[in-house]
């Protein structure tokens, strides 16, 4: 099974081992301060607080909003996001104070059309969620609506940018949250961070996140929480931030490979990637595709890939589908389309090129499956069927069967169609297309065939 995500932590353990050997395993120890300083330097932010997970940090966004702007009674929320965003909001506000926004079919984020943003209520707040690492240009929204208070769930957008600064660090945001969960670009297992550029918010939150203790030990003067990160988690964070350039370079390369291998499906509009906002740079967190016109259910789609030993995830459900949020209105058909058509595919930092090829091959197969075609894959056990078919083509002098002699072997291996060998009906020999390499003599040939009834339909690379 090619898992959806596996952390690559083995090279970032030295500081954690030191922390264990030194006996500093709780929220005290040298790596709390060291990691905080490193994170501030990397993000070029004034204040950060390391926390035990991203959800706690997101909860603190709403606590900060309530503290600074107690009279705000409407918070605009995104649809189709990980549930932590809404659960965090509901820990501070009641559901009637939350209003769900429309979604954008192209960015898979909230609709940021100027007319729509200008139509929103005055003196409200908005939670920005950078879905799947696609960054929303918050400074642009603030310029359109200076009266709206913005807070950012940056748990999936960490390392993304808007206007050449890291997402979640703009003065236009009250504060933002980061997740260092096991499937994130940087991981501490669990873990997260709270970011702000505002001193009053920092001073409030530094007390709230650590039991609300007064100047007298064990006397507490405010309702607060224990959201502290451990020194061991901070040690993992410290080692990774020190190598952040290489970590990001590796992830960018993985994304570039997927983009190249999937290029034909993108060109032929079989799949789409998300569209980015102007002046933004997305975070290379988890590669996702939208399968245009997917006729299969989420369960059928997931099952298909699992049978091919590919672990995928569906896009986040419309919020009204969660039982405790079922009273929400969902007048946005786009949210249902995105939920059905988008899948997240394996994006581990240590995924191999061969594994990426296998993932892409499974996507090609699913596209055919989505057309309700009976797919038959030629293997070594039934290669004689293919040879028999090829001989018939030769006899009939089908000019659409093309031969390529003395092709470079790497070129053949990298050509996606050489890996996909499909047959619709073995008995009638009606086929979408074949690819075959014959090593029967010193030279070899490479052939592609596309059945007449499928020509011009732009199926796969054929």
Report each predicted region and the residues it spans:
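Conserved acetyl-CoA-binding loop-helix of GNAT-fold acetyltransferases
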Residues: 450, 456-462
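N-terminal "arm"/small-domain region of PLP-dependent enzymes with the aminotransferase-like
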Residues: 1-26, 346
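Conserved active-site segment immediately N-terminal to the catalytic lysine
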Residues: 151-188, 216-219
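Acetyl-CoA-dependent GNAT
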Residues: 389-453
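PLP-dependent aminotransferase class I/II
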Residues: 31-38, 42-49, 125-129, 135-138, ...
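Phosphate-binding glycine-rich loop
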Residues: 28-75, 80, 88-95
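PLP-dependent aminotransferase-like
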Residues: 64-154
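Conserved N-terminal entry element of GNAT/NAT acetyltransferase domains
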Residues: 1-2, 368-384
């Amino acid at each position: 099974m090619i898992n959806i995500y596996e952390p690559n932590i083995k090279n970032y353990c030295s500081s954690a081992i030191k922390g264990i050997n030194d006996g500093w395993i709780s929220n005290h120890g040298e790596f709390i301060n060291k990691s905080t300083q490193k994170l501030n330097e990397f993000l070029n932010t004034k204040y950060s607080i390391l926390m035990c997970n991203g959800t706690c940090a997101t909860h603190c966004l709403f606590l900060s909003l309530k503290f600074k702007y107690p009279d705000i009674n409407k918070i605009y929320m995104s649809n189709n996001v990980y549930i932590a965003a809404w659960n965090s909001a509901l820990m501070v506000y009641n559901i009637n104070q939350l209003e769900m926004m429309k979604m954008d079919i192209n960015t898979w984020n909230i609709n940021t059309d100027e007319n729509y943003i200008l139509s929103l209520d005055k003196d409200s707040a908005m939670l920005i969620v950078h879905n799947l690492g696609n960054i929303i240009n918050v400074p642009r929204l603030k310029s359109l609506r200076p009266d709206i208070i913005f807070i950012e769930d940056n748990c999936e957008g960490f390392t993304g940018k808007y206007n050449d600064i890291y997402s979640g660090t703009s003065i236009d945001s009250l504060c933002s949250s980061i997740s260092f969960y096991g499937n994130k670009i940087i991981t501490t297992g669990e873990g997260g961070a709270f970011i702000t550029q505002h001193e009053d918010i920092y001073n409030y939150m530094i007390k709230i996140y650590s039991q609300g203790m007064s100047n007298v030990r064990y006397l507490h003067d405010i309702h607060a929480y224990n959201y502290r990160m451990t020194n061991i988690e901070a040690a993992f964070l410290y080692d990774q931030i020190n190598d952040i350039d290489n970590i990001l370079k590796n992830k960018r390369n993985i994304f570039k490979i997927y983009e190249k291998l999937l290029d034909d499906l993108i060109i032929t509009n079989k799949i789409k990637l998300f569209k980015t906002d102007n002046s933004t740079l997305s975070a290379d967190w988890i590669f996702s595709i939208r399968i245009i016109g997917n006729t299969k259910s989420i369960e059928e789609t997931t099952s298909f890939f699992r049978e091919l030993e590919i672990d995928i995830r569906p896009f986040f459900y419309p919020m009204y589908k969660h039982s405790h949020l079922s009273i929400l209105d969902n007048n946005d058909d786009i949210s249902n389309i995105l939920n059905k058509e988008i899948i997240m595919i394996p994006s581990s930092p240590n995924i191999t090129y061969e594994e990426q090829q296998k993932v892409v091959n499974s996507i090609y197969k699913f596209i055919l499956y989505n057309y309700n075609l009976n797919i038959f894959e030629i293997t070594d056990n039934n290669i004689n069927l293919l040879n028999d078919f090829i001989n018939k083509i030769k006899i009939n002098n089908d000019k659409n069967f093309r031969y390529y002699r003395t092709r470079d072997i790497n070129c053949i291996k990298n050509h996606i169609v050489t890996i996909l060998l499909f047959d619709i009906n073995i008995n009638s020999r009606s086929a979408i297309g074949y690819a075959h390499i014959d090593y029967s003599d010193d030279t070899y040939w490479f052939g592609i065939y596309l059945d007449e009834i499928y020509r011009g339909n732009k199926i796969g690379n054929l």
